[in-house]
Each structure stands twice: as C-alpha cells, then as structure tokens.
Amino acid sequence: IASRMSFSSLKRKQPKTFTVRIVTMDAEMEFNCEMKWKGKDLFDLVCRTLGLRETWFFGLQYTIKDTVAWLKMDKKVLDHDVSKEEPVTFHFLAKFYPENAEEELVQEITQHLFFLQVKKQILDEKVYCPPEASVLLASYAVQAKYGDYDPSVHKRGFLAQEELLPKRVINLYQMTPEMWEERITAWYAEHRGRARDEAEMEYLKIAQDLEMYGVNYFTIRNKKGTELLLGVDALGLHIYDPENRLTPKISFPWNEIRNISYSDKEFTIKPLDKKIDVFKFNSSKLRVNKLILQLCIGNHDLFMRRRKADSLEVQQMKAQAREEKARKQMERQRLAREKQMREEAERSRDEPERRVLHMKEEATMANEALMRSEETADLLAEKAQITEEEAKLLAQKAAEAEQEMQRIKATAIRTEEEKRLMEQKVLEAEVLALKMAEESERRAKEADQLKQDLQEAREAERRAKQKLLEIATKPTYPPMNPIPAPLPPDIPSFDIIGDSLSFDFKDTDMKRLSMEIEKEKVEYMEKSKHLQEQLNELKTEIEALKLKERETALDILHSEHSDSGTSSKHNTIKKPQAQGRRPICI
C-alpha cells in the first residue's frame, strides 16, 4: 500500500504543461502547452494569436546541431529533438515563398511578416541585392515606417540610426552616410500617399525578382564527388556552382519532375522526360535529406495549387481583404478630408486677426500720408507768403525807379557832360525798371502757382482724412457663410465571394502547364521593364563613386548578368535538354 501511495504521489507531481517561447520577426510570445500537444496544436495556437489565416507559407523552426529543422505537425512537440530546458524556443518564420507576392499574399499580417523576413535576409546579406535596388528598397522601408515625407519633421540626419543598406553596399562606394541618406530620401519623397501595407508590398515586388530570393541552399556532392549547391524554391530545383549562387548550372521546374526520393544520404530526382537521365547526389547528413524532401513536397504542392482555381477559403479571404482595403481607403480619405477641414477652420479663425492687422497697417500708412500732406501744405503756404512779399517789394522798387527816372528827366542839366551822364543814368534806370517789372511779373506767376499747389495739397489732405475715416468705420468681422464640403461617393460593398483568376487544368497536362508558365514569364518581364529603368537610372548616378577593388564575387557576377540582360530571376533558369539518353554533366 505504501509503495502504491508513493507511486500515486509521484505521478501527481509530474508537470502537465511546459512553456514554449515563440519568436517572430518583431515580437516574442510565451505559451503554456500540454505535454500531449502535437506540432499542429502549437502551430494553430500561434496562428490564432497572430490572426494569421494563410498558414501554408509558415512553420516553426528550430536548430539541431547547427542544422535547421521544422516542427512536424503530426508529431508531439516534445518528441522532436529539441532542448528540454524551458522555455522551449521556436522561431515562427516563412517556410515557403510565393511566386507573385502581390497576387498570393492576401492578409496584411502575412505581407508584413514576409516583408520583415525578406528585409532581414537582404540586410544580413543572405540574399544578394545590387546597390541600386538596395537604395530603392530602403526608401520603401522608410515609407513603411515613417509614413509620408515631411521636410519639417524628417530633417537631415533622421535616418542616421536606421539600418537600411547591406554593409557590402556601403563599403563598395566612396559615399558618406549623409550622401546615402540624401539618395534614399529623394526616392522616399516620391512614395507620398502610400500606406504601410502598400509600401511593404512594393518592397516585396522588387525583392522577389532577386536571384537568391526564396532559395534554400544545401551543400551536395555528385557521383564524381564534386561539391555543388542544391537550391530549392517556389519554381523548382536548381543546381549551382558553389562560387556562383546567382545563376544555376541546371534547373528542374516542378512541372517537369516525376519523382523525388532519398535513401540514406543519396537523393534522387527523376525528370518527367524519360529521355533525360535520373540525377543523383549525396548530402552530408540524413537529416538534411529529410529537410530537402519536406521543402520539395511543400513547394511542389503550392506550385500546383497556384495553377488551379482558388479554394473557397482563399476566395473568402480575398473578398474580405478587398473589403478591408476599401474600408481603409475610405478611412484615409475621411482623415484627409478632416485634416483639410481643420486647416481651413484654422485659416478662417486666423482671418479676422489678419484683417485687423491689415487694417491697422492701412491706417498707419494713411496717417503717415496725411502728416506728409499737412507738412507739404504748410511749407507751400509759407513759401507762397514769402514769394508774395518779395513780389510786393519788387513792385515797390520798380515804382521808385520810375519816379527816379521821371525826376532825373525833369532835372535840368546844363553841361553836355552832365547831360550825357544823365542820359546814361536814365538808360540804366530804364533797363533796371524793365528788369524789375519782369521779375515782379515772374514772382507774381510763381505766387499764383504756389497758391494752386497749396489748393491741391489741401485737397489731398481732405482725401487722406476721408480714407482714414472709412478705415476706422469699416467692420472688423465680415459675415462668412461656410459651405459644407460634399461627402465622397459611397464605396460599393463587396460580395463575400469575389471574382478570381482561374488556372484550372489537370496535373498530368504538363505541356499545357509549361506553356502557361512561359506566358506568365513574358507578362512578368513586361511589368518589370519600368522598374528596371528606375534602377538603371540610380545605378548610373552612383557608378562613378564605386570602389572597384571592393567588389565581391557576387557583385562581379551580377554586373556580368546585367550586361548580358540575364539578371532577372526568371532569366537565370536553365532547363536540362533532352538529347538522347545522355547523362547530365555538372
């Protein structure tokens, strides 16, 4: 009995739960999990907490002896080879990548998680990104974080603490942080009006065209023992030279692969075309082969699903996303309208004050003009009085000269000399009298003119006083009749099930599927032409500052691909050619 009681008490003390820490790209969460929980139970809990419905892209990642592994959905969490120390840590990350982010990523939370993960891969240089594309991507990252550019807020140096460019790009050019900020800000200013989700989607649309985007690389060896790289992505399997991760030596698109399998460390790829030999290679660990097969199965399933009609769940999500987008657009319009009305109200509130200030300025100017008019009138009156007195004095002198002349004429001069002298004096007196008369006449005219000027000055003074009186009696607050702004037209509601583009075909119809893929590539290249022109323009701007001696092998390879026109992800895929039953040489 005692032994049974001891066993029962020990059984009761065993923990029923354990703690798990989930690390996302921008947060950490902790959960208490039951001991019996499987991977799917924990994964579903995390997705519900995040509000994530596009679960097929994601997984819970952990590390085993420097090897990446993913939590299996049908296996108990604690049965995995994970640390038993609590909390058990998993990273919630994107396991599979979309071919076209804009069409496939529906929810805003999905787009945001992909944006954060891809941005980190580019900054950590796990995905090669050319310098001109790095600057453009940085400008969209700034738009997503800070919103619209405002020179009064986003002043010089506001990006000093931000990590926006790969260190490789910064070291490659003889440019200061201020010069990089200037170029990023120039692009950033052009993104005005884009919301956070729109800026993040533009980031992903550019990033998805990078050669290393979404590719998982594994070190392998072929039958000859040559070391190669295997790349697994949304489009298929690719074989690379270890020194060149940008351009595959050969590719196997998912629609051209018949079977994938592994036995111990040997991995086998069987092409659909039986004329092409089976490709076999060896990996370093059995665990790596399991991971490769997981990624192959998941990517192949998504590849085939994209080329079929959307499921009802996806259609509903897309309809809800459209409704949410329309709601946010309407909300942005409402906020913009409220901002405009607020600015107009502030202007209306300040208008009376501005009017009063303007009227004060007008009154001051009118008063100064009046004072100047009064001073001018006083001066003119004084001058007119002086001129009039001078004219009277000259007239008096002229009369005296005339009297003197008459007196001299009347005086009898006896001697001839006196007579001659007298005649000369008479002549001089006549000339002087004539000059006096002319000067008197001129002064009289000048006095008349001054009187006229005085009269005009008085009239100007009267008008200035009248204007000052009008300003003083003018109403300060004119009546205003605000006209309410019209409301925007109603945005149409959306049905739960919206229209969707259908690619319905049988899985066995591989020829038709291949034609569809080629058509998608052509359409994609047309869409990316404008973006490439923008990137070429920026590349030309900064090319002169490049330090050639600091170029990495990937920089040189990318430049060669750009010169040959094969820098696009779609252009680098090389398919195996069927030429009899010859083996594939890599």
Curated annotation (Swiss-Prot):
InterPro entries: Band_41_domain, ERM, ERM_C_dom, ERM_FERM_C, ERM_helical, Ez/rad/moesin-like, FERM/acyl-CoA-bd_prot_sf, FERM_2. Keywords: Cell membrane, Cell projection, Cytoplasm, Cytoskeleton, Membrane, Nucleus, Phosphoprotein, Tumor suppressor, Ubl conjugation. SMART domains: B41, FERM_C. It holds the Pfam family ERM_C. Interacts with NHERF1, HGS and AGAP2. Interacts with SGSM3. Interacts (via FERM domain) with MPP1. Interacts with LAYN and WWC1. Interacts with the CUL4A-RBX1-DDB1-VprBP/DCAF1 E3 ubiquitin-protein ligase complex. The unphosphorylated form interacts (via FERM domain) with VPRBP/DCAF1. Interacts (via FERM domain) with NOP53; the interaction is direct. Interacts with SCHIP1; the interaction is direct. Probable regulator of the Hippo/SWH (Sav/Wts/Hpo) signaling pathway, a signaling pathway that plays a pivotal role in tumor suppression by restricting proliferation and promoting apoptosis. Along with WWC1 can synergistically induce the phosphorylation of LATS1 and LATS2 and can probably function in the regulation of the Hippo/SWH (Sav/Wts/Hpo) signaling pathway. May act as a membrane stabilizing protein. May inhibit PI3 kinase by binding to AGAP2 and impairing its stimulating activity. This is Merlin. It comes from Rattus norvegicus. The gene is Nf2.
